[in-house]
A protein has these predicted regions:
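Terminal accessory carbohydrate-recognition/targeting modules of carbohydrate-active enzymes
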Residues: 1-249
Length: 249
C-alpha cells in the first residue's frame, strides 16, 4: 500500500482542502470517507456507512466526530465543516490546527494548538460494520478537557436527513451509548469508548450541513445529523493519553 502524506501547505484554504478525498472499505459493502481536512463534501461520506444486508442496503449510521479542547477558560474547536445558516454559507475551520494528514489504507490526522495536541486514526474492521477511531492526546503544562461530539444518522447512503427523519431511542450502558432508530428497531447503533464521561447536549441536531460537491451538482446539498451526547476526557498536564472508540451495528 502506497502512503500518501500531506501537510498544511496542501490546504491553504477550506475549499482547497476538500478537493482531496479518502475512502476505506470493509469488504462487505460498507465504507467510510471524507475529505483530507475532515469536512464532508458528499452525501456518500461518513465514518461508517454500514451494509445492512451485505453487500447492499448501505446506510449512513455514524457521520463523524467533532472535537474541542478546554484549557483553563479557553476552548478551541477542531470542527471542520460547511453549513448553511441564515441564507449564507458558514465555515468551521478546524483545518487551521491540522498539521498533517496521512492515508495508508487507513486515515491519520494530527492537530496542534497551544498546550495541546492530538492524533486521530480512523479505520474499518474487515468483514464487519465496525468503525474504530483511536486518539492519542497530549497535554502541555496545563490540565485539559478533551470533548468529543459524535454525529449519528440513519439514512440510505444517497439520501439526506432532516430532524423529522432522525428519531431514536437512546440509552447508556457501561461505557457505551446506544441508539435504536425509530425507522428500524431491529438494529442498534453502538458507540463505545475506552474511557470518558457521557453528558446530554442541549442542542441535539446538527442542522443544514452543506456538502459542496452536491451543491456543485445543483442540489441544495443539505444534510442533518443527530448529536445528543458529548464525551469528555480529562487529560492531566504533561501527560499523553490513548482513547479508543468503536462504533458498530
Amino acid at each position: 500500500m502506497i502512503t500518501y502524506q500531506y501537510t498544511q501547505k496542501d490546504w491553504t484554504t477550506f475549499k482547497e482542502g476538500i478537493k482531496r478525498e479518502w475512502a476505506v472499505t470493509n469488504g462487505i459493502g460498507g465504507y467510510a470517507g471524507s475529505s483530507m481536512i475532515g469536512a464532508h463534501s458528499r452525501t456518500h461520506q461518513g465514518y461508517l456507512i454500514a451494509s445492512l444486508h451485505a453487500p447492499i442496503e448501505r446506510y449512513l449510521v455514524f457521520s463523524k466526530i467533532n472535537e474541542t479542547v478546554t484549557v483553563g477558560t479557553r476552548t478551541v474547536s477542531f470542527e471542520t465543516s460547511q453549513h448553511r445558516a441564515s441564507g449564507k454559507t458558514v465555515y468551521a475551520e478546524g483545518q487551521k490546527f491540522l498539521t498533517s494528514f496521512i492515508y495508508d489504507g487507513s486515515v491519520h490526522y494530527a492537530y496542534e494548538t497551544d498546550n495541546f495536541s492530538f492524533e486521530k486514526h480512523i479505520t474499518l474492521k474487515r468483514n464487519a460494520n465496525v468503525c474504530a477511531v483511536a486518539y492519542e492526546l497530549t497535554a502541555g503544562d496545563s490540565d485539559c478537557t478533551f470533548t468529543l461530539t459524535p454525529l449519528f444518522n440513519y439514512r440510505e447512503h444517497s439520501e439526506s436527513s432532516t430532524p423529522d427523519t432522525l428519531k431514536f431511542e437512546t440509552f447508556t450502558e457501561d461505557r457505551a451509548f446506544y441508539l435504536v432508530p425509530e425507522k428500524n428497531k431491529d438494529i442498534a447503533i453502538r458507540f463505545q469508548t475506552s474511557e470518558g464521561t457521557f453528558s446530554e447536549r442541549e442542542t441535539v441536531y446538527d442542522i443544514d450541513m452543506q456538502l459542496q460537491i452536491e451543491v456543485d451538482l445543483e442540489t441544495d446539498g443539505l444534510d442533518c445529523h443527530y448529536c445528543p451526547v458529548d464525551l469528555s476526557i480529562a487529560v492531566p498536564a504533561n501527560t499523553t493519553k490513548k482513547v479508543s472508540i468503536l462504533c458498530s451495528i
